[in-house]
From Swiss-Prot:
It catalyses: N-acetyl-D-muramate 6-phosphate + H2O = N-acetyl-D-glucosamine 6-phosphate + (R)-lactate. Belongs to the GCKR-like family. MurNAc-6-P etherase subfamily. The active site is at E86, E117. A lyase-type mechanism (elimination/hydration) is suggested for the cleavage of the lactyl ether bond of MurNAc 6-phosphate, with the formation of an alpha,beta-unsaturated aldehyde intermediate with (E)-stereochemistry, followed by the syn addition of water to give product. PANTHER family: GLUCOKINASE REGULATORY PROTEIN. It comes from Clostridium botulinum (strain Loch Maree / Type A3). It comes from the Bacteria. One of its GO terms (biological process) is amino sugar catabolic process. Its EC number is 4.2.1.126. This is N-acetylmuramic acid 6-phosphate etherase. It is an enzyme of class 4 (lyase). Specifically catalyzes the cleavage of the D-lactyl ether substituent of MurNAc 6-phosphate, producing GlcNAc 6-phosphate and D-lactate.
């Protein structure tokens, strides 16, 4: 257990702006919370340089066969699992490429597992169970920056030569000193003292969104601002796939539906076939040669 006292943590300090939150009308209470929430985006903005460095590292890792692994406890762990779980349907990647590990295992997603966050060894065990390697990226998430479970993971990852990133909301935390890249949006005291699922959790979610989204953009999963590697696994996504191809190419719905059927709803290939006027096999050959980057594939045939 690290010996940082809670009274030194920004996230545990008392918020002077909300001391009377229990004595005001409902609307005023919500305004207090909303005023605090407005500070989150500004805090994240101040960390963009560090976030950019992290995105570059993650993107390179993906291109070299590495993975993005989130570790955290409680709210922080849940946010990692949430971000990871959205990557396969959104970007068509395997469920192994971006993974979230929460202290205490899957059951801790729904019910707190007291004490799980206090074990460094438990995180090391969890990382070994997924064959974590030096080619992977480890993102440790903890509002306080002092969670032993996460610190154990960061230390282990450093020890095997992997890139480590910390996402905390306290400056100069132990985690930030251990990680290769420190991302620490300082959102200030919570509206409810110590309730880091609020501003700190929101800031962490914003950062994780940027990390995964930025890396997917860097690795050709986006064309313009369209998610061209999504998996059309339900009716809504089938319709979205059609709209994406129409938006990307300007083609009529009838042509788009025909091409999508031909490619088994491979959105990226469908777009390139329409843009290049090539047959399926030739289009796929060129797209594969350019590692799935539509822009680069189009340049090759221009």
């Amino acid at each position: 257990m690290t010996n940082i006292s809670l009274d030194k943590l920004v996230t545990e300090s008392r918020n002077e702006n909300t001391k009377n939150i229990d004595r005001v009308e409902t609307l005023e209470m919500l305004k207090m919370i909303n005023d605090e929430d407005k500070k989150v985006a500004e805090a994240v903005e101040k960390e963009l340089i560090h976030i950019a460095k992290a995105v570059e590292k993650i993107g390179k890792a993906f291109l070299n066969g590495g993975r993005l692994i989130y570790v955290g406890a409680g709210t922080s762990g849940r946010l990692g699992v949430l971000d990871a779980s959205e990557c396969p349907p959104t970007y068509g990647v395997s469920y192994d490429l971006v993974r979230g590990i929460i202290a205490g295992g899957e059951s801790a997603m729904f019910k707190a597992r007291e004490g799980a966050e206090d074990s460094k060894k438990l995180c090391i065990k969890d990382l070994k169970n997924i064959d974590f390697s030096k080619n992977d990226i480890l993102v440790g998430i903890a509002a306080s920056g002092r969670t032993p479970y996460v610190i154990g993971g960061l230390e282990y990852a450093n020890g095997i030569g992997a890139t480590t990133i910390s996402v905390t909301c306290n400056p100069e935390s132990e985690m930030s000193k251990i990680a290769n890249i420190s991302i620490a949006p300082v959102v200030g005291p919570e509206a409810i003292t110590g309730s880091t699922r609020m501003k700190a959790g929101t800031a962490q979610k914003m950062v994780l969104n940027m990390l995964s989204t930025g890396a997917m953009v860097k690795t050709g999963k986006v064309y313009g601002n369209l998610m061209v590697d999504l998996k059309a696994t339900n009716e809504k996504l089938v319709e979205r796939a059609k709209r994406i191809v129409m938006q990307a190419t300007g083609a009529k719905r009838e042509q788009v539906e025909r091409i999508l059927e031909e490619t088994n709803f491979d959105v990226k290939l469908s777009i390139f076939m329409i843009e290049s006027s090539l047959e399926k096999m030739k289009a796929k050959e060129i797209l594969d040669k350019n590692k799935g980057y539509i822009v680069e594939a189009i340049k090759e045939i221009s």
